[in-house]
UniProtKB/Swiss-Prot annotation:
Belongs to the UPF0235 family. SUPFAM superfamilies: YggU-like (SSF69786). It comes from Chlorobaculum tepidum (strain ATCC 49652 / DSM 12025 / NBRC 103806 / TLS). SMART domains: DUF167. Pfam families: DUF167. InterPro entries: DUF167 (IPR003746), YggU-like_sf (IPR036591). GO terms for cellular component: cytoplasm. This is UPF0235 protein CT1832.
Length: 105
């Protein structure tokens, strides 16, 4: 199963976040989810905001195009990305993660 799915016009991305990391970035796969490390603490929505900003930058879309669909208070989240195709998301992930993303995608 892939962490990428399509729901209507948007792409859904299943992620697992690790707040309070030493550095922010996409860390690889966590089972069937994309693992994202965040410097922010999960307080006052800071980690969710950082997660959306990080993915928006990685996918080349505006920050407003990325939102948390499910799991706002959980480490496991489903993010909705508008203005991009599943193939473009997959390509961006492969560019960031190499072979590990291809295995999960």
């Amino acid at each position: 199963m892939s962490p990428i799915s399509q729901k209507g016009e948007a792409v859904c991305l299943s992620v697992r976040v690790q707040p309070r990391s030493s550095k922010s970035g996409v860390a690889g796969m966590y089972g069937e989810q994309l693992k994202i490390c965040l410097k922010s603490a999960p307080v006052d929505n800071a980690a969710n905001k950082e997660c959306c900003e990080l993915l928006a930058k990685a996918l080349g879309v505006p920050r407003s195009s990325v939102s948390v669909m499910k799991g706002a208070s959980s480490r496991s989240k489903v993010l909705k990305v508008e203005g991009v195709t599943p193939a473009a998301v997959r390509e961006a992930l492969v560019g960031m993660l190499g072979d590990e993303a291809e295995a999960g995608a």
